[in-house]
Every structure is written in C-alpha cells, then in structure tokens.
Amino acid sequence: MQLEYLNLISQAKVIAEKQFKANPFSFETIWKEVVKHFKISKQDEPSLIGRFYQDFLEDPNFVYLGDRKWKLRDFMKFDEWNKISQSMFVTKEIFEEGYEDLSNKKVEPEEGVGDFIMGNDGDDNETGSEIVQGLINDSFSEENQ
C-alpha cells in the first residue's frame, strides 16, 4: 500500500481537530483513527507506523504534554505552550546561572603523579629511584636475618 506520509499526518491533524479538539490524546488513539480512516490493513500497519510516528514527532502541530499524552498546538494558549517548550528545552536557566569565568585565570601546576606515588613531596633531596632502592635494600636485609 503506497500512502503518502504527508497525507497520514495531515489527516491525523484533521482527526484530532474534530475528535479531540482541546483534549489531550494518546498516540495509539490517533494511530487507530488514521488506520480506520485510510482502511490500512493489519499487514501494512508495521511498515507505516514507524515513519508515521517519526513524522508525528517532527510535526509542530502536535505537542507532547508528558505521560504519553499529546495535544494540538492550535488549541493551546501561548502561555501553556511556552511553559511546555521551556521545560523541554531548558536553555535559559542553564546559561544564565552565574558560572565563574575560568578563561583568564592562571592555573598552578599540580604535584606530579610520580611524585605522589613515590612519596616525594619536594621537602627532601631524595629522588624516587633512591627511595625505591632503599625499600629494596630494606626488604633484602629483613629476609637475610
């Protein structure tokens, strides 16, 4: 069955306008109505539903409310739609919070990992290899006793 996906989406909008008006509806409900309207067979449903769902998600006429409910944007007040869109795309709060500007700060060099592992904190004159050699000598002297 060769149905144009645009026809499916545009018909879904017409169905939603007539049946649901300002009431929320589920995707399953609108899909069943589209199937009924176009007399889509059970065999053809699996090949059509995926693309229809993708187009449904991308269509700005359908607004997701959460809890698997949708609503037509035409029946929403601007404040209601704006609140939903702001909650989905929280850009204002993230970028306006006071973050410290680190771009011009001079970063102090940290103690090297090797120095930390070897126990060299810079206070003595022993190198890491001298410390290791001392540990090896201590372990051999303990074994020989």
UniProtKB/Swiss-Prot annotation:
GO terms for molecular function: DNA-directed RNA polymerase activity. It comes from the Bacteria. The keyword Transcription applies. This is Probable DNA-directed RNA polymerase subunit delta. Belongs to the RpoE family. RNAP is composed of a core of 2 alpha, a beta and a beta' subunits. The core is associated with a delta subunit and one of several sigma factors. Residues 6-75 form the HTH HARE-type domain. It comes from Mycoplasma genitalium (strain ATCC 33530 / DSM 19775 / NCTC 10195 / G37). GO terms for cellular component: DNA-directed RNA polymerase complex. Transmembrane segments: none annotated. One of its GO terms (biological process) is DNA-templated transcription. Keywords: DNA-directed RNA polymerase, Nucleotidyltransferase, Transcription, Transferase. The keyword Transferase applies. Participates in both the initiation and recycling phases of transcription. In the presence of the delta subunit, RNAP displays an increased specificity of transcription, a decreased affinity for nucleic acids, and an increased efficiency of RNA synthesis because of enhanced recycling.
